[in-house]
Amino acid sequence: MQEDDLEPSSVKEFADLSEQELDRIESLVQNLLKITKLDAGSIVIEKHMENIADMMRDIELHFAYRARQEQKELLLTGPDSISLLCDRDWLTEAIDNIVKNALDHTEKGDAIRIEWKSFSSAVQITVKDNGCGIHPEDLHHIFKRFYRSRFSKDTQGIGLGLPLAKAIIEAHNGVIEADSELGKGSVFTMNFLTSDL
Protein backbone atom coordinates (compact mmCIF):
# COMPACT_ATOMS: atom_id res chain seq x y z
CA MET A 1 0.00 0.00 0.00
CA GLN A 2 1.33 3.41 -0.91
CA GLU A 3 1.29 6.34 1.49
CA ASP A 4 -0.99 8.29 -0.86
CA ASP A 5 -3.66 5.58 -0.50
CA LEU A 6 -4.04 6.08 3.25
CA GLU A 7 -7.04 7.97 4.53
CA PRO A 8 -6.26 10.76 7.03
CA SER A 9 -8.50 9.02 9.58
CA SER A 10 -6.49 5.78 9.18
CA VAL A 11 -3.23 7.63 9.69
CA LYS A 12 -4.58 9.32 12.83
CA GLU A 13 -5.90 6.02 14.20
CA PHE A 14 -2.55 4.35 13.57
CA ALA A 15 -0.69 7.26 15.19
CA ASP A 16 -3.00 7.14 18.24
CA LEU A 17 -2.54 3.37 18.62
CA SER A 18 1.22 3.74 18.25
CA GLU A 19 1.28 6.42 20.93
CA GLN A 20 -0.76 4.23 23.29
CA GLU A 21 1.62 1.32 22.77
CA LEU A 22 4.67 3.53 23.35
CA ASP A 23 3.10 4.82 26.59
CA ARG A 24 2.41 1.23 27.66
CA ILE A 25 5.99 0.14 26.93
CA GLU A 26 7.40 3.18 28.74
CA SER A 27 5.21 2.38 31.75
CA LEU A 28 6.43 -1.23 31.71
CA VAL A 29 10.09 -0.18 31.63
CA GLN A 30 9.56 2.40 34.40
CA ASN A 31 7.77 -0.16 36.60
CA LEU A 32 10.50 -2.74 35.99
CA LEU A 33 13.14 -0.21 37.01
CA LYS A 34 11.22 0.77 40.13
CA ILE A 35 10.69 -2.83 41.25
CA THR A 36 14.35 -3.67 40.59
CA LYS A 37 15.49 -0.66 42.62
CA LEU A 38 13.12 -1.54 45.47
CA ASP A 39 14.41 -5.13 45.44
CA ALA A 40 18.01 -3.95 45.50
CA GLY A 41 17.33 -1.56 48.36
CA SER A 42 18.69 1.31 46.30
CA ILE A 43 15.62 3.47 46.79
CA VAL A 44 15.50 5.58 49.91
CA ILE A 45 12.00 5.97 51.29
CA GLU A 46 11.95 9.51 52.70
CA LYS A 47 9.11 9.64 55.19
CA HIS A 48 7.37 12.78 56.37
CA MET A 49 4.00 13.33 58.02
CA GLU A 50 1.54 13.63 55.13
CA ASN A 51 -2.16 14.43 55.11
CA ILE A 52 -4.02 11.45 53.66
CA ALA A 53 -6.99 13.49 52.39
CA ASP A 54 -4.63 15.74 50.39
CA MET A 55 -2.90 12.70 48.89
CA MET A 56 -6.21 11.08 47.91
CA ARG A 57 -7.44 14.32 46.31
CA ASP A 58 -4.23 14.40 44.24
CA ILE A 59 -4.92 10.82 43.11
CA GLU A 60 -8.52 11.74 42.27
CA LEU A 61 -7.27 14.69 40.21
CA HIS A 62 -4.76 12.47 38.41
CA PHE A 63 -7.53 10.13 37.21
CA ALA A 64 -10.38 12.66 36.85
CA TYR A 65 -10.06 13.05 33.08
CA ARG A 66 -9.90 9.30 32.43
CA ALA A 67 -12.85 8.65 34.74
CA ARG A 68 -14.92 11.32 32.95
CA GLN A 69 -13.98 9.94 29.53
CA GLU A 70 -14.97 6.41 30.60
CA GLN A 71 -18.08 7.68 32.44
CA LYS A 72 -16.96 6.21 35.76
CA GLU A 73 -17.15 7.78 39.19
CA LEU A 74 -14.29 8.37 41.64
CA LEU A 75 -15.56 8.84 45.19
CA LEU A 76 -13.47 9.88 48.21
CA THR A 77 -14.51 9.24 51.81
CA GLY A 78 -12.46 10.03 54.89
CA PRO A 79 -11.66 12.70 57.44
CA ASP A 80 -9.34 15.61 56.63
CA SER A 81 -7.47 15.14 59.91
CA ILE A 82 -5.59 11.86 59.30
CA SER A 83 -1.85 11.99 58.68
CA LEU A 84 0.62 9.20 57.99
CA LEU A 85 4.41 9.02 58.16
CA CYS A 86 5.22 8.08 54.56
CA ASP A 87 7.04 8.96 51.38
CA ARG A 88 4.27 10.87 49.61
CA ASP A 89 5.54 10.26 46.06
CA TRP A 90 6.06 6.53 46.51
CA LEU A 91 2.83 5.88 48.39
CA THR A 92 0.90 7.92 45.82
CA GLU A 93 2.49 5.76 43.12
CA ALA A 94 1.29 2.59 44.89
CA ILE A 95 -2.29 3.79 45.30
CA ASP A 96 -2.27 5.16 41.73
CA ASN A 97 -1.52 1.63 40.51
CA ILE A 98 -4.43 0.20 42.50
CA VAL A 99 -6.85 2.88 41.25
CA LYS A 100 -5.63 2.36 37.67
CA ASN A 101 -6.27 -1.36 38.08
CA ALA A 102 -9.80 -0.60 39.31
CA LEU A 103 -10.43 1.67 36.30
CA ASP A 104 -9.10 -1.04 33.98
CA HIS A 105 -11.60 -3.58 35.35
CA THR A 106 -14.77 -1.51 35.61
CA GLU A 107 -17.36 -0.51 33.03
CA LYS A 108 -19.19 2.68 32.09
CA GLY A 109 -21.34 3.79 35.03
CA ASP A 110 -19.26 1.92 37.64
CA ALA A 111 -17.68 3.59 40.67
CA ILE A 112 -14.32 3.44 42.42
CA ARG A 113 -14.35 4.42 46.10
CA ILE A 114 -11.21 5.47 47.94
CA GLU A 115 -11.74 5.46 51.71
CA TRP A 116 -9.41 6.09 54.61
CA LYS A 117 -9.77 5.85 58.37
CA SER A 118 -7.62 5.80 61.45
CA PHE A 119 -7.56 3.20 64.21
CA SER A 120 -5.67 3.34 67.50
CA SER A 121 -2.51 1.85 65.99
CA ALA A 122 -3.02 1.93 62.21
CA VAL A 123 -4.19 3.94 59.23
CA GLN A 124 -6.29 2.04 56.72
CA ILE A 125 -6.82 2.98 53.07
CA THR A 126 -9.21 1.01 50.88
CA VAL A 127 -9.90 1.11 47.15
CA LYS A 128 -13.25 -0.49 46.27
CA ASP A 129 -14.88 -0.97 42.91
CA ASN A 130 -18.09 -2.53 41.65
CA GLY A 131 -16.46 -3.94 38.52
CA CYS A 132 -16.06 -7.46 37.18
CA GLY A 133 -14.24 -8.80 40.23
CA ILE A 134 -11.28 -11.17 40.35
CA HIS A 135 -11.70 -14.85 39.55
CA PRO A 136 -11.17 -17.01 42.68
CA GLU A 137 -8.33 -18.88 40.93
CA ASP A 138 -6.51 -15.58 40.44
CA LEU A 139 -6.97 -13.93 43.82
CA HIS A 140 -3.88 -15.46 45.43
CA HIS A 141 -1.69 -14.65 42.43
CA ILE A 142 -2.52 -11.01 41.62
CA PHE A 143 0.51 -9.63 43.48
CA LYS A 144 2.93 -11.89 41.58
CA ARG A 145 5.05 -10.22 38.92
CA PHE A 146 3.94 -10.68 35.32
CA TYR A 147 0.91 -12.71 36.40
CA ARG A 148 -1.82 -12.51 33.77
CA SER A 149 -5.13 -14.18 34.39
CA ARG A 150 -6.46 -16.41 31.68
CA PHE A 151 -9.86 -14.92 32.59
CA SER A 152 -8.94 -11.31 31.75
CA LYS A 153 -8.12 -11.54 28.06
CA ASP A 154 -10.17 -8.43 27.33
CA THR A 155 -7.85 -6.03 29.19
CA GLN A 156 -4.26 -5.19 28.42
CA GLY A 157 -1.65 -5.31 31.09
CA ILE A 158 1.76 -6.62 31.92
CA GLY A 159 1.11 -7.67 35.50
CA LEU A 160 3.46 -5.23 37.24
CA GLY A 161 1.16 -2.56 38.70
CA LEU A 162 -0.10 -4.54 41.68
CA PRO A 163 3.29 -6.14 42.51
CA LEU A 164 4.86 -2.67 42.44
CA ALA A 165 2.12 -1.33 44.72
CA LYS A 166 2.71 -4.22 47.13
CA ALA A 167 6.49 -3.64 47.18
CA ILE A 168 6.02 0.07 47.91
CA ILE A 169 3.46 -0.58 50.64
CA GLU A 170 5.73 -3.17 52.26
CA ALA A 171 8.62 -0.67 52.10
CA HIS A 172 6.36 1.50 54.31
CA ASN A 173 5.93 -1.43 56.75
CA GLY A 174 2.40 -1.76 55.45
CA VAL A 175 0.27 -4.69 54.35
CA ILE A 176 -2.05 -4.96 51.36
CA GLU A 177 -4.83 -7.52 50.95
CA ALA A 178 -7.38 -8.08 48.21
CA ASP A 179 -10.89 -9.42 48.49
CA SER A 180 -13.20 -9.91 45.55
CA GLU A 181 -16.49 -11.36 44.45
CA LEU A 182 -16.79 -12.27 40.80
CA GLY A 183 -19.27 -10.00 39.05
CA LYS A 184 -19.58 -7.68 42.06
CA GLY A 185 -16.21 -5.99 42.45
CA SER A 186 -12.99 -5.91 44.43
CA VAL A 187 -11.64 -4.32 47.58
CA PHE A 188 -7.95 -3.59 48.13
CA THR A 189 -7.16 -2.85 51.78
CA MET A 190 -3.88 -1.28 52.91
CA ASN A 191 -2.96 -1.07 56.59
CA PHE A 192 -0.08 1.01 57.93
CA LEU A 193 1.00 0.69 61.55
CA THR A 194 1.21 3.99 63.41
CA SER A 195 1.96 2.69 66.91
CA ASP A 196 5.69 3.32 66.46
CA LEU A 197 5.15 7.08 66.09
Predicted regions and their residues:
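Short alpha-helical segment of the dimerization/phosphotransfer core of two-component systems
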Residues: Q20-I25
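Short beta-strand/loop element within the Bergerat-fold HATPase_c
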Residues: G109-S121
